[in-house]
């Protein structure tokens, strides 16, 4: 009888292991333009208590990425109740919803649509959207959260990794969490990883008056700070020029270097999503 019980327990353990571990672990990176891309917008700071973002803001960048060879599904995520023109919804919230909760909603969506099927994804987050991605990966394995996520690349555009003084201008929960040294930011792990590894690229701009150096203020394998063009906070997804005339400071883990003929932000995003060394 004991042998039967042990055999049954072992069978259950094997089944659970099969459920909790991907059939094809993402242990080795594959450079390609074939992974689904999830686009996550940032905060709506308006005082109208009717939070909304227009996901069509991503259209120019998405069109360029397709022209450059990305042929997998692209998802623009709705999380405010009044968001418009989004392809997919991960919730119906407002500005008083904690970024931790938004991270959970994103993690749950990725799990249900891709990770459970063994498919890795990439994420592009603008502003607070980058922190939502960070929160999604940081808490996997916690009670009620997905056990893991298959996220190969994350690119953050103008994300206040160390907070933004502009967040003192509003009083929503999300604004409070975006302030420098907030309890949320202090509790948020740096460089959180998906199953098999996640390659982070942080993109900031010296002309982004809301974020500036905070845009590259997290431990990451790749960081780039634009000096020219003069990207403001809403310009990151509007420059899809193929020109290689940008002035940047960039860091791939060996210190900061100046580069005066770099890719512009749209094409840099393409390379960051495609190549693990860029």
What are these regions (language model features)?
Residues 28-278:
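Lipid deacylating catalytic domains
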Residues 1-28:
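Secretory targeting and sorting signals
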């Amino acid at each position: 009888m004991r042998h039967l019980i042990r055999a049954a327990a072992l069978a259950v353990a094997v089944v659970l292991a099969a459920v909790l571990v991907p059939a094809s672990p993402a242990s080795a990176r594959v450079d390609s333009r074939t992974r689904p891309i999830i686009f996550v917008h940032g905060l709506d700071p308006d005082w109208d208590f009717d939070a909304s973002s227009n996901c069509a803001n991503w259209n120019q960048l998405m069109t360029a990425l397709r022209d450059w060879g990305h042929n997998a599904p692209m998802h623009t995520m709705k999380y405010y109740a009044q968001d418009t023109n989004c392809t997919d919804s991960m919730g119906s919230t407002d500005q008083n919803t904690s970024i931790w909760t938004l991270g959970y909603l994103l993690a749950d969506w990725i799990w249900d649509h891709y990770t459970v099927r063994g498919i890795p994804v990439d994420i592009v987050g603008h502003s607070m959207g980058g922190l939502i991605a960070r929160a999604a990966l940081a808490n996997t394995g916690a009670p009620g959260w997905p056990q893991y996520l298959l996220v190969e690349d994350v690119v953050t555009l103008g994300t206040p990794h160390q907070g933004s003084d502009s967040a003192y201008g509003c009083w929503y929960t999300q604004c409070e969490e975006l302030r420098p040294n907030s309890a949320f930011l202090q509790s948020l792990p740096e460089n959180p990883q998906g199953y098999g590894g996640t390659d982070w690229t942080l993109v900031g701009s010296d002309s982004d008056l809301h974020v500036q150096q905070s845009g590259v203020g997290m431990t990451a394998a790749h960081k780039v700070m634009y000096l020219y063009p003069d990207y403001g906070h809403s310009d990151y997804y509007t420059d899809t020029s193929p020109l290689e005339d940008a002035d940047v400071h960039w860091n791939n883990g060996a210190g900061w270097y100046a580069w005066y003929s770099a890719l512009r932000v749209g094409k840099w995003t393409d390379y960051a999503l495609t190549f693990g060394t860029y």
